[in-house]
């Protein structure tokens, strides 16, 4: 199925690209989320008329994401207290929700879906570097300092 992308989609293309995708992917994901429209003659003409407006909107979203990333990077470190054993292992773990809540309490609103933990949840006391994906192209880093209560 041919679609016109209205937003940058990872591993697929960017704004304005006409790509061929499976019908289910277009029908169930791209079109409902507003990331694409079917590539009919009418939609192609409509898109070309609105191209500058959509590019400006995309640039605004990107600049807002970069501003949020700068705020997150300005925090540098956030401390989370949790119960831990003698060897520094936590009773339980610190996941994306706990990290998002701690960063939000520190002054920058962050959703748990923006927290990236490639090595899994935090299970030890100490400093851990955590990435935040604010936008598909914009990342931020904060050091999470886990201390025992």
UniProtKB/Swiss-Prot annotation:
The record's annotation in Gene3D superfamilies points to: Ribosomal protein L9, C-terminal domain, Ribosomal protein L9, N-terminal domain
* One Pfam family it belongs to: Ribosomal_L9_N
Record keyword Ribosomal protein present? yes
Q: Which GO terms describe its cellular component?
A: ribonucleoprotein complex; ribosome
Instruction: Check the record and name the SUPFAM superfamilies matching this protein.
Output: L9 N-domain-like (SSF55658), Ribosomal protein L9 C-domain (SSF55653)
Q: Which domain of life is it from?
A: Bacteria
Q: Which GO terms describe its biological process?
A: translation
Which GO molecular function annotations are given, in alphabetical order? Answer: rRNA binding; structural constituent of ribosome
Alphabetical keyword list: Ribonucleoprotein, Ribosomal protein, RNA-binding, rRNA-binding
Look up keyword rRNA-binding and say if it applies.
Answer: yes
Q: What does this protein do?
A: Binds to the 23S rRNA.
Q: Please state which protein family the record places this protein in.
A: Belongs to the bacterial ribosomal protein bL9 family.
**Name of this protein:** Large ribosomal subunit protein bL9
Organism from which the protein derives: Klebsiella pneumoniae (strain 342)
């Amino acid at each position: 199925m041919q679609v016109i992308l209205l937003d940058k989609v990872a591993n697929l293309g960017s704004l304005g690209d006409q790509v061929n995708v499976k019908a289910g992917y277009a029908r169930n994901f791209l079109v409902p989320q507003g990331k694409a429209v079917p590539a009919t003659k009418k939609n192609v003409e409509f898109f070309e008329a609105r191209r500058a407006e959509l590019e400006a909107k995309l640039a605004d979203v990107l600049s807002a994401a970069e501003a949020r990333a700068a705020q997150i990077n300005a925090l540098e470190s956030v401390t989370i207290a949790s119960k831990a054993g003698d060897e520094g292992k936590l009773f339980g773990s610190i996941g994306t929700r706990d990290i998002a809540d701690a960063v939000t309490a520190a002054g920058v609103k962050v959703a748990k879906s923006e927290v990236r933990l490639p090595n899994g949840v935090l299970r030890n006391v100490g400093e851990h570097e955590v990435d935040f994906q604010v936008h598909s192209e914009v990342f931020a880093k904060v050091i999470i300092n886990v201390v025992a209560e």
